[in-house]
Amino acid sequence: MAVEGGMKCVKFLLYVLLLAFCACAVGLIAIGVAVQVVLKQAITHETTAGSLLPVVIIAVGAFLFLVAFVGCCGACKENYCLMITFAIFLSLIMLVEVAVAIAGYVFRDQVKSEFSKSFQKQMQNYLTDNKTATILDKLQKENKCCGASNYTDWERIPGMAKDRVPDSCCINITVGCGNDFKESTIHTQGCVETIAAWLRKNVLLVAGAALGIAFVEVLGIIFSCCLVKSIRSGYEVM
């Protein structure tokens, strides 16, 4: 039958889309973890809407992977209930992704503000807390930055000499290189702006990926509905 052949094609395309969903799920989880790592490095301890975004992204990725598994089982067994469940869950994921995108846009400035406040707060403990010093040094070294807004923030730290910055601010790091420094020998840009730039760059990547994922999800919903209709009508699509 022509319809049977058409449904076989739809079923095959649905399998391809399910593989794409798995890849998208892994991508979302990776992006969420990467953003969460940056938030941890920026020492943002407060639980706010901005800091929860990566957790939501990871959760959506994990749920998408689970939904793809349900869809695969439903398509393989040609189970009406599983395919309906797959289509409904896929629609819910699309709504959550839209909500996350809106939240990311709304709270973008708040995230930067969190970075700044938390970074400056922890700078006060640089000379008295070795753990904090290690984290800040790692952050400054990896991001090639110095201070929150810029290197002059270190001048306001109790116990820190006016002509000194941490060695991790130096372009070429050696022991004591932060003493009697020159602007030409250190990174002058603040870490808050550096991290904010990283986040802005990745927000664009996430936005582009989200559009691609949304398109694939729409196709998934359409194909699953076609398969559901075929199953309900009693066609054999093995």
Swiss-Prot record:
Pfam families for this protein: Tetraspanin
GO molecular function ontology, one term from the record: protein-containing complex binding
Organ and tissue specificity: Detected in mast cells and platelets (at protein level).
SUPFAM superfamilies named among the record's database cross-references: Tetraspanin
Single GO cellular component term: late endosome membrane
Record-linked InterPro entries: CD63_LEL, Tetraspanin/Peripherin, Tetraspanin_animals, Tetraspanin_CS, Tetraspanin_EC2_sf
Entry comment on modification after translation: Palmitoylated at a low, basal level in unstimulated platelets. The level of palmitoylation increases when platelets are activated by thrombin (in vitro).
Localization annotation: Cell membrane; Lysosome membrane; Late endosome membrane; Endosome, Multivesicular body
Keywords on record: Cell membrane, Endosome, Glycoprotein, Lipoprotein, Lysosome, Membrane, Palmitate, Protein transport, Secreted, Transmembrane, Transmembrane helix, Transport
Keyword Transferase set for record: no
Summary of the function given for this chain in its UniProt record: Functions as a cell surface receptor for TIMP1 and plays a role in the activation of cellular signaling cascades. Plays a role in the activation of ITGB1 and integrin signaling, leading to the activation of AKT, FAK/PTK2 and MAP kinases. Promotes cell survival, reorganization of the actin cytoskeleton, cell adhesion, spreading and migration, via its role in the activation of AKT and FAK/PTK2. Plays a role in VEGFA signaling via its role in regulating the internalization of KDR/VEGFR2.
A GO biological process held by the record: positive regulation of receptor internalization
Motif Lysosomal targeting motif location, chain numbering: 234-238
Residues on Cytoplasmic side: 2-11, 73-81, 225-238
Source organism of the structure: Rattus norvegicus
Predominant cellular place of this UniProt entry's protein: membrane
Family the entry assigns: Belongs to the tetraspanin (TM4SF) family.
Record protein name field: CD63 antigen
Membrane topology, from the record: Multi-pass membrane protein
